[in-house]
Every structure is written in C-alpha cells, then in structure tokens.
Amino acid sequence: MAMAMGHVMLREFHLDNPSQYFTDYVRRYTDMPMLVMLEERDGYYAAGRMLRAADLVDSLGQENNPEWKTVAINSNGDMVAPNGSIGFRWGEKGKWNLEQRDGTSGDETELQLSLLGSQDDIAEVGFPYFGGEGTEHFSKVELENILLHKLPVKRLQLADGSTALVTTVYDLTMANYGLERGLNDENCATSYDDVKAYTPAWAEKITGVSRSQIVRIAREFADNADKTHGRSMIIVGAGLNHW
C-alpha cells in the first residue's frame, strides 16, 4: 500500500502539480539528481552504479578523491560534481555539506532532476517485480518478473574511451513507480484504476483496501507535508528497529 501511496504522491505533487517545497527538497537533500550508469542485459538495460567524477575525462577537475564523487547535470546542461558526496569528506575543507555548489568552482548551481526533454535517446530499463508471488496469506497480481520501462538517457564518453548511457535517480524512481510521462510506456499507468505495478488499483487487489481510500490518505498525507514543510509522520508499532 505504501508503494501505491508513493505512486499518488509522485503523480500529483511532482508531475501534475509540482510542489515547490518537494521539488526543492529532493533537489537539495537527496540523490535524485545524480546520474546512474545503465548496464546492458539481455535485450534491455538495468540500473548499475552511480557515475563518478573519476569515470570522466579529467575527472571534472576533481583531483581529490574523484572516485568517490557523484555527478549530476546542472540547469545549464553542464556536468558537475556537487558538494556533499563522500569524496568531499576528507582532503578538502568546507565542501562536505549540502550547499548547491559546484565542487570544482564553488559557484552556486541548480541540479536537473530529470533528463526528460534534454535526453539523447530513450532506453528500455528493466525493474524487478515481486508482487506476482502469492501465498495463502498474501494475494498476488501476476505481471512479468522484469518490467521494462522507457527512460530518457544521456550518452557519455568515459575516460577509458568507452561509451555509457546514464539517467538520473529521479527518472529511475518515476519509472519504477509506473508513472507515465509521455513516453508511451506500456508498463506505466495512465489512471489510478489501471491494474499495473504500484497503482492504487494494484494495491487494492493485494491489500483489500479500496483504491479510493488509498488515494485519499496519500493525497492528505502529502498535502499536509507540503503545507507544513515535512511535518507528516507514519507511526508504526514496536518492532525490530524500535529498540
């Protein structure tokens, strides 16, 4: 059900009617803008590791720990190694923070969350799906074990001469949640009533909670977080991590 709530929140507060607070938060304080290298599989791609400054020609000017510095694309279309990744922890002062600054120049920079609209190509990326395995106590929704989604990608020349396809964590997240963004992705939903991975209708079949209730609680939870700048909380009972 939490996945279906996430589907609603991302659809309504990031795509259809973007919340300035949410957008600014994920841009500044999460790895959503960071680039991820895609690995070739049998007829499709899969998410690999983060792109690092050391993967690129001249390491984006980073001489200190470039193999530990993640990379993003800023609003000007330039690749940068922004402050805050673990590579800035040692050997440099004043850069292990979440200020929106280029780690090389120190200039303020705004990171792109998505490659959509500036992509070099569209690639099919596979995501594992585990909701098709049911038991007598767990209802299932049978879909393919690997769900292929269409993602915007950039094609980069690496320091070793090879070429890599990259996308952002944000784009991977949107695809994994099954959110259609104009790419004609048959495994993405165009309605909350579509029984596709992580929609309210999908969750209703597994949990028995009506899709309308899932949509309502997700919408209210996100709306409160938007208006109060994050003051929404899910409280669970005592468990393994409680103590």
Predicted regions mapped to residue ranges:
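Generic beta-sheet signal
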Residues: 230-234
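Long, well-ordered, tryptophan-enriched scaffold segments
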Residues: 1-227
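Conserved short loop/turn motifs at secondary-structure junctions
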Residues: 202-206, 236-243
